[in-house]
From Swiss-Prot:
Coiled coil (UniProt feature): 9-102
Phylogenetic placement of the source organism: Eukaryota, Viridiplantae, Streptophyta, Embryophyta, Tracheophyta
Matching Pfam families: Frigida (PF07899)
Record-given protein name: FRIGIDA-like protein 3
Family stated for the protein in its record: Belongs to the Frigida family.
Length: 558
C-alpha cells in the first residue's frame, strides 16, 4: 500500500513538473542563440500522453489487486469451511468410537456380573468344598497343571471351580450333561432337534461348555464328519442333513470363542494347550486342499466350508500357521454371512479390508462391499450410494441371451425379475444403514410397483381361459332311465328333467298295456266325423311307469 501511495503522489506532481519545464523552455526560447526544432505544443502533448498511459496502467494494477484480494478471501473461507467439516467428522467419529467402546464395556461388565452373580449350588450337610474350589484362581493354573498325566490341560472339577467361573443353564439343562459327558454326537443331535431356538441355544452353550472337562477337545470332536468319507449322493435329505451339521459345527466354534473371550491368559493357555492347537492345525491342513475346488461365483458369498475353515483358525488361534494371501482369497466366499466382519477382525485382516472390498466391487458384490465398508468405517473411500447405483446398473444389464429391448418374452421376464430383486435388495441395504437422505427410496418403490404390475398383467394374460360354470338350476324332480341304463349310470343320480318338455307326437305316443293300464276306464268312442282314431288314454302314467302331469288334450276341430 505504501508503494501505491508513492506512485499516486508522483503522478499528482506531474502538472507541477510540466509547469517548471514550461518556464525552462521559455528561458531557452528567450535565448535567440539556441535554435529548437520542437515546438512547445508537441512536447506538451507528448507528456500528457505519457501521463494518461501511466494512469491507465495504474488503474489496471489496482483492479488486479482487488481481484487477487477477493480470490484470497474466498480461498480462506473455503479452507475454513473444509477445516470445520473435517473437525465435525473427527468429532462424529470420536463419538461413534466412544459409543462403541461404551457398548463393549457395558457388554463385558454385564457378562462379568452375570457370571459372578450366578448362583452356585451349595454342598449338602456333611460335605466340603473341593480344595481347588476355595483356592485362589491364580494358583489353580500353576505351571504344574499341565503334567505328564494331564497333557491336554483338562480342567478338573470345573462345576464349582473358579477356573471357568460360575455358570447356570436355565432353558436347556440337558446341555450340562452332554458337555459333562463330552458327548459330541449327542450335542449335535440336541442342537439339530432344537434348531428353532438357536438364539437361546447360542446363549447357553458357552455356559454349558464350562461343564466339559476339555471344551476345546469337545468342539474338535464335533467337527468329525464335516467332510463325509462317502461320495455325495443325489439324496436331498442327506444333503440337507449335511448342511445342518456344518452349520452346527460353525455355531459350536463360535460359542467356544465366546467362552474363550471371557478367560484370562492363564486359563486360555490351559484350554488352548499345544496339543489342542496341534490337533486343530491338523484338521485345518486337511480342509485347506478341499477349499481350492470352491468357485467364488458359485458360492455367492455364503460358503459354509470357507466359513468353517476361517472360524477354525480364529477360534483356536492358529492363524499364524497359514498364509495371509490364502485367507484373503476366502473372504469373498463368506462376504454375505453376518459374521464376516467379526471373522475378519478375529483373523487380523482389518488392515487388508480395502483390498477385499475392491475385489467384491469388481466381482459384482456391491451390497457385501457396502456392508463391509460400514463395518470397517471405509465409507469415505468407498461411497455407499455409488456402489448401490452400480449394483442396480448391473442388475439391469442384459444377459448373454440378448438385450431387454429385443429379447424373447422369457428373457424379458428374467430381466424384470433380476431388476425387481435388485431393487428390493438395495432398499433393504438403504434402510439398514440409514441412507434415505443420501439415496431416496421413493423412486425405487415406484419402479417396484411398475414391475410387479407388469408381472401380474402378463401372468393374467398367459393364463388359460377357464370355462364358465353353468348357471345353477332350481330344485327339480329326478327321474331315472329304463332298467338298461341304470347300470350304466356311474354317478348314481337320476336324470334331471329339463325345464322344457319335448314336443311329443301324440298320435305315435307309446303306451303300456297291463294291469295298471287295464284299470283305467276306456275312452268314449269318437264321433264318426273324425278322420283319425286317437290313441287310448293311459292316465297320468308314462311309458316308464312314473307319474307325470300330462298337458291338456288338444281341441277337436269339426
Amino acid at each position: 500500500m505504501e508503494d501505491t501511495r508513492s506512485v499516486a503522489s508522483l503522478m499528482d506532481s506531474t502538472s507541477s513538473k510540466i509547469q517548471q519545464l514550461q518556464k525552462a523552455f521559455a528561458e531557452l526560447e528567450s535565448q535567440r542563440a539556441v535554435t529548437l526544432n520542437l515546438k512547445w505544443k508537441e512536447l506538451e502533448e507528448h507528456f500528457h500522453g505519457l501521463e494518461r498511459s501511466l494512469k491507465r496502467r495504474f488503474h489496471e494494477l489496482e483492479d488486479q489487486e482487488k481481484e487477487y484480494e477477493t480470490k484470497t478471501r474466498k480461498a480462506q473461507e473455503l479452507l475454513e469451511k473444509k477445516k470445520a467439516a473435517v473437525e465435525a467428522k473427527e468429532k462424529a467419529a470420536l463419538e461413534r468410537l466412544q459409543k462403541k467402546r461404551d457398548a463393549a464395556m457395558f457388554t463385558i461388565n454385564s457378562a462379568l456380573d452375570k457370571y459372578n452373580n450366578a448362583p452356585v449350588s451349595k454342598p449338602s450337610v456333611g460335605e466340603r468344598w473341593p480344595q481347588n474350589a476355595v483356592e485362589d484362581s491364580s494358583n489353580v493354573f500353576a505351571a504344574d497343571s499341565i503334567t505328564d498325566d494331564n497333557p491336554d490341560g483338562i480342567v478338573q472339577d470345573v462345576q464349582i471351580s473358579p477356573v471357568m467361573g460360575n455358570y447356570e443353564v436355565k432353558a436347556y439343562p440337558q446341555l450340562l450333561k452332554l458337555c459333562g459327558d463330552m458327548d459330541s454326537t449327542g450335542l449335535h443331535k440336541f442342537v439339530s432337534d432344537n434348531r428353532k431356538n438357536l438364539a437361546s441355544l447360542k446363549e447357553e452353550i458357552p455356559m454349558a461348555f464350562r461343564a466339559a472337562a476339555n471344551p476345546a477337545s469337545l468342539v474338535l470332536d464335533s467337527l468329525e464328519g464335516f467332510y463325509p468319507m462317502e461320495a455325495p449322493t443325489a439324496d436331498g435329505k442327506k444333503d440337507a442333513n449335511l448342511l445342518g451339521m456344518r452349520r452346527t459345527c460353525i455355531m459350536l466354534m463360535e460359542c467356544l470363542s465366546i467362552l474363550l473371550s471371557g478367560l484370562d491368559r492363564n486359563c486360555l493357555a490351559v484350554v488352548l494347550s499345544q496339543n489342542v492347537k496341534h490337533r486343530a492345525k491338523t484338521i485345518a491342513e486337511g480342509w485347506n486342499p478341499l477349499l481350492e475346488s470352491l468357485d467364488m461365483d458359485a458360492c455367492n458369498g455364503n460358503s459354509l466350508e470357507a466359513h468353517a475353515f476361517l472360524q477354525l483358525l480364529a477360534t483356536f488361534a492358529i492363524v499364524a500357521d497359514f498364509k495371509e494371501d490364502e485367507l484373503l482369497k476366502l473372504i469373498p466366499m463368506v462376504s454375505r454371512r453376518r459374521q464376516a466382519a467379526e471373522l475378519c477382525r478375529s483373523l487380523g485382516l482389518a488392515e487388508k479390508m480395502p483390498g477385499v472390498i475392491e475385489v467384491l466391487v469388481n466381482s459384482g458384490k456391491q451390497i457385501d462391499a457396502v456392508n463391509l465398508a460400514f463395518a470397517f468405517e471405509l465409507t469415505e473411500q468407498f461411497s455407499p450410494v455409488s456402489l448401490l447405483k452400480s449394483y442396480l446398473i448391473e442388475a439391469r444389464r442384459s444377459s448373454p441371451q440378448g438385450r431387454p429391448g429385443n429379447a424373447s418374452p422369457a428373457v424379458q421376464d428374467e430381466f424384470n425379475e433380476r431388476e425387481l430383486i435388485g431393487l428390493k435388495t438395495v432398499i433393504k441395504c438403504i434402510e439398514e444403514h440409514s441412507l434415505e437422505e443420501q439415496y431416496p427410496v421413493e423412486p425405487l418403490h415406484k419402479r417396484i410397483l411398475q414391475l410387479e404390475k407388469a408381472k401380474a398383467d402378463k401372468k393374467r394374460a398367459t393364463e388359460p381361459m377357464k370355462p364358465q360354470p353353468k348357471r345353477p338350476r332350481g330344485a327339480q324332480p329326478r327321474v331315472t332311465d329304463n332298467n338298461n341304463n341304470i347300470n350304466n349310470n356311474k354317478t348314481g343320480y337320476g336324470r334331471v328333467i329339463p325345464e322344457r318338455y319335448p314336443q311329443y307326437v301324440y298320435d305315435n305316443r307309446p303306451f303300456l298295456s297291463g294291469p295298471i293300464m287295464a284299470a283305467q276306464p276306456p275312452p268314449p268312442p269318437p264321433p264318426q266325423t273324425y278322420t283319425f282314431n286317437p290313441a287310448p288314454a293311459h292316465g297320468n302314467f308314462y311309458a316308464n311307469c312314473y307319474q307325470y302331469q300330462a298337458p291338456p288334450p288338444p281341441p277337436y276341430f269339426h
